[in-house]
C-alpha cells in the first residue's frame, strides 16, 4: 500500500468516527427515550441541585399561555377604553314596589334612585300609601329595619324589587290604621278617638287631663289622615263630626287635604274644605294640596279646590246652596273654564 493511499484511508476513518460521536448528541432524545433521564441524573450527581430537566420543562412551558390569558383578561377589565364600552346595567331612575304587609296591598313607586335615602322613600310613601311617616317601618329581604339615613344602594335594592312596609305595633297604631283603611266608622269609634272613650293601651292606661286629650286627638288625626287618603267619605264625615281636626299636621307638615288631593278624592276634598281645610297649607317640602294635585295630574281635584276657595272668599258659606251644587256638578263633568259668573237669586 502506498503512503498516499494509507493517508487517505486514515482520514476517511477519522471522519466516520467523528460522525458516530456526534450522532448521540443530536438524536439521543429521539432514538433513546431514557437518555434525557440519564443526563438529568448525571447533572444532579454533579451538584446542579435542581429537579429533573424533563419534569421542570413540562411544568414551565404550559404556564406561559395561562399567564398571557390572565393578562389579557385583566386588560379587558381595567382598560378605561374597554370599561367605557361596557353597558351600564343599573338605570339611574327605576321603579320599586312596596307591599303594605298588614293588608297585602301593593304600591308602585316611580322615580327611585340608588342614592335615594330611606327617609326620602318614606316621604313619598306618606302620600302614596297614606301612612304617616312616623308610623312606617320598611324592610327589605332580610327583614331588618331600614334606617332613615341609609340609601337604597347601601341595601342593594334592585330595580323592580319589593320593599315591605309595616306599621309600628306599639300603642295600638296597627289596629287604628287598619280600621281607617277599611273605613268602618263603627270600628273607629272603639279605638280611642274621643275623650270619653274607654279604649286604653299599655302606654295610655294612666293618661289624664291634657295628656289624655292630646293622645286621643292625635289618634283621631291619624284616622282622618288615612281615611281621607283612601276616600272613605262616611268615615271622614264621622271623624270630622266627632272632633278630628283637619288643620292638624303630620310630622312632614301635611294635612288630610294633602293626601286627599294626592289621590284625587273629590268628595273628601269637598268635605274637608267645608270644615275649614286650607288649600294654601305648605308641607315640609313647600308643597300645597293644589301643587300636589297638579304634580300628580289630578286636574279635577285641582279645579275643585280652586273653585271652592274662590267661592269661600266671595262670602258664600252654605255649600248646600243650589248655585254651589250646580257649580260643583259642572266641575265634576269636566268644565274647563276658570271663570264662573255668579247670578243672584
UniProtKB/Swiss-Prot annotation:
The gene is ANKRD60. Residues 96-172 form the Ubiquitin-like domain. Signal peptide: none annotated. Residues 15-26 have a biased composition (Gly residues). The keyword Methyltransferase does not apply. ANK repeats lie at residues 219-249, 252-281. Pfam families: Ank_2 (PF12796). Residues 1-57 are annotated as: Disordered. Residues 1-14, 27-45 have a biased composition (Low complexity). This is Ankyrin repeat domain-containing protein 60. It comes from Homo sapiens (Human). SUPFAM superfamilies: Ankyrin repeat, Ubiquitin-like. Keywords: ANK repeat, Repeat. The keyword Lyase does not apply.
